[in-house]
């Protein structure tokens, strides 16, 4: 069995970096070194006081130490990592672009006055979970050892649990919306029309190459052996050349 350090070092770069930042953001807030409102997305402070960091730090706070925090962090460690190692294997730039697209979309949605979302970590994790559920739609998931369901339904099941445990439904719902938008534009629409409007920009490839982050190889990705099925429950069988 590998040690915790070996496991951590084996994680893919983007998921590892995001999970680490989320963990330390909560630790620093728990130790009262940082105040959560200091990390929150509040557009009047962004534009009037030039507190630009809020556009970034709002994605790293998953809440104070709690069961919900632990669940979200485990989602990054399990589903984000599996997504980056599997469907996005050797395509680090594409995975990073998915995260950037998700962040920009969530920032735009949170600017709508009646939404009022100040922390975007939960929506981002929900987006990752949704994309994972579309890439691996037929995996069997056990929820707390009580219920077995197809992974295709997992984002909606987690949304239901948020309601049961008294959490807000809107952050998770927006994450699902952004995840579906990404999957439609990057996978479903190109497969149907041959046109990819969400192709990873060259500057993202250059960033990955410049800092030697992960692997850049746009080879087609074969579906996982467990992903057999038909219709709406079938993951993509290939991705058009990026």
Curated annotation (Swiss-Prot):
Reported tissue expression: Seedling shoots and roots.
GO-annotated biological processes: endoplasmic reticulum unfolded protein response; ERAD pathway
Q: State its location(s).
A: Endoplasmic reticulum membrane
Give the stretches traversing the membrane: 21-41, 56-76, 95-115, 158-178
Topological domain (Cytoplasmic) residues are: 1-20, 77-94, 179-242
State the UniProt keywords alphabetically. Endoplasmic reticulum, Membrane, Transmembrane, Transmembrane helix
- The stretches that face the Lumenal side, renumbered to this chain, are 42-55, 116-157
The way this protein sits in the membrane is described as: Multi-pass membrane protein
* Source organism, top-level taxon: Eukaryota
Task: Report the principal subcellular site.
Answer: endoplasmic reticulum
Of the GO CC terms on this record, one is: endoplasmic reticulum membrane
One GO MF term attached to the UniProt entry: signal recognition particle binding
Please give the function described in this protein's UniProt entry. Answer: May be involved in the degradation process of specific misfolded endoplasmic reticulum (ER) luminal proteins.
The family annotation for this protein states:
Belongs to the derlin family.
| Name listed for the protein in its UniProt record | Derlin-1
Q: Which species is this UniProt entry from?
A: Oryza sativa subsp. japonica
Name the lineage: Eukaryota, Viridiplantae, Streptophyta, Embryophyta, Tracheophyta
